[in-house]
């Protein structure tokens, strides 16, 4: 799949860091683990060897996945974005029409989404409903749990922390 996908500069740094760690640390470590397990004799009944080979397969698969992702990434520097309309990278504060509670979300790429840090994927129902809206607009968000209505209170573009 050659489709580009948006990612923040910080998110891209995180992917690159994981890729370098897997290639230069984990790959060497697992090779040493496999060599050590081989020294224990019969490989057909060597659980240590099998576990190390499985871990190696996982690491190699993740390396390929990360290489593909970094090749397809379209890096967007949120610090250089501005405007009143909500788009990728926006930090959006909303008021829930039902509860009057204020909630803030940051719209990021799908590989950066982390609801515990209020980072929602650009492909999520809330982000899809918010894209193109601006302060004062009302949005209706349909989720698996039902429909929610929000008012957009602020739209900001600021650098993310890792």
Swiss-Prot record:
One of its GO terms (molecular function) is DNA binding. SUPFAM superfamilies: FKBP-like (SSF54534), GreA transcript cleavage protein, N-terminal domain (SSF46557). It comes from the Bacteria. The keyword Coiled coil applies. GO terms for biological process: DNA-templated transcription elongation; regulation of DNA-templated transcription elongation. Residues 45-74 form a coiled coil. Keywords: Coiled coil, DNA-binding, Transcription, Transcription regulation. PANTHER family: TRANSCRIPTION ELONGATION FACTOR GREA. Belongs to the GreA/GreB family. Necessary for efficient RNA polymerase transcription elongation past template-encoded arresting sites. The arresting sites in DNA have the property of trapping a certain fraction of elongating RNA polymerases that pass through, resulting in locked ternary complexes. Cleavage of the nascent transcript by cleavage factors such as GreA or GreB allows the resumption of elongation from the new 3'terminus. GreA releases sequences of 2 to 3 nucleotides. HAMAP family: GreA_GreB (MF_00105). This is Transcription elongation factor GreA. The gene is greA.
């Amino acid at each position: 799949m050659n489709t580009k996908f948006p990612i923040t500069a910080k998110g891209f740094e995180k992917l690159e860091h994981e890729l370098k760690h897997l290639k230069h640390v984990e790959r060497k470590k697992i090779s040493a683990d496999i060599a050590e397990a081989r020294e224990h004799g019969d490989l057909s009944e060597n659980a240590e060897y099998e576990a190390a080979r499985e871990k190696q397969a996982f690491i190699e698969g993740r390396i390929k996945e990360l290489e593909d992702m970094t090749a397809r990434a379209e890096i967007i520097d949120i610090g250089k974005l501005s405007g009143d309309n909500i788009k990728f990278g926006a930090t959006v504060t909303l008021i829930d029409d039902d509860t009057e509670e204020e909630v803030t979300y940051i719209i990021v790429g799908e590989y950066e989404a982390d609801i515990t840090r209020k980072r929602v994927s650009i492909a999520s129902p809330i982000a899809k409903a918010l894209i193109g809206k601006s302060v004062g607009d009302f949005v209706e968000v349909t989720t698996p749990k039902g429909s929610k209505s929000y008012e957009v209170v602020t739209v900001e573009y600021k650098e993310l922390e890792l």
